[in-house]
């Protein structure tokens, strides 16, 4: 029997928000069942590959993570099924990178200025081994005098070995370039947006991440200055601001490529704040001249390096050319397989998309900014529309379907297409890791090529 109550129930079921209903015009299905691919490059093939590469199970494919390890295994399996030859190490498709984490080990780091001992944190932080600063992995300085060395990067000033040998050189500034982090690194005005449907949370979280990167020294450019090392300095101190983000980062391992042995064995380096610098010399650093001497310091700490449990690795395969006279010439196709992993906080998919559509149409190329009233109204309308269709979907996984899942699937599709066409020249397909961490995989391949680079056309 049909009743008004049953009709109302059916109507409610039909109009209630559903997570599987699309909101955006270009939104694809939430899931995609893998299907057999074909030599031609087709939308179905691209979806089949992309839905696997960017799946939540890959956990954002951060370099050295289990997710990226799984993604590289998938890529190698595709190469294997296509009949491509392994071109990695030891007869495999893989080229491992010595990627891992530097972490402080042993007793807590200590810096003694005169007779005052400071724990690492708000006033100073020891630096992990680094190519830009030339810093070593450990410090065991005992009552070593300090000498002011001027501004880091000012190579017009020559450091006299007679003054600096066996001493601790103190620079204003350090290897990180001020301002290089980008115009959208800190957007405090975004945090004051009204809390509407989570739109402000999406913006504030993005601003917080960028500000955290700025504070902890994660910046895309760095200066090199090896004058202190060349002058025989026993250690290096950089006078720079220190805040809570930078201090907290010292207590946790940070993933990085290990530096050369000669640099790991180089002089230890640390950042000190302006107050500590004043204690060293008895006056502000801005009033010092190169060669001014300060009090002696004692500094002890030790970093150790460990490779990731799931190795960071490139995936490399060769399609051998069909023409014997040209098979020794290679055409190289590459894309990076990694992304940025998992955020510390979850944001709502639809809120974030609404904010980015309105305020950042060019994606990361647009700075984080406060929406105009008109933009805020548009954002609110978009999110209200989304809420009428489905509930919020909070997520912390940065899936990387576009960056660079799209490039990865095109690499695989190109490999399948060319494998069916038997080109005259050989082709080498390189799936790099570590692009997001600073082009690490591509640099490692060019520094340690598995074929002669001059054979690449």
Residue ranges and their predicted role:
Residues 448-457:
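A glycine-rich helix N-cap at a beta->alpha junction
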Residues 22-35, 40-66, 82, 86:
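N-terminal capping segment at the start of a domain
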Residues 51-54, 96, 146-148, 168-172, ...:
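Structural recognition of the beta-strand scaffold that forms the well-ordered cores
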Residues 30, 118, 124-161, 259-400, ...:
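Soluble metallo-hydrolase cores and metallopeptidase-like ectodomains found primarily
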Residues 64, 158-161, 180-188, 240, ...:
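Short, solvent-exposed loop/turn and secondary-structure capping segments
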Residues 175, 242-243, 337-339, 431-437:
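Acidic, glycine-rich active-site loops and adjacent beta-strand->loop/helix elements
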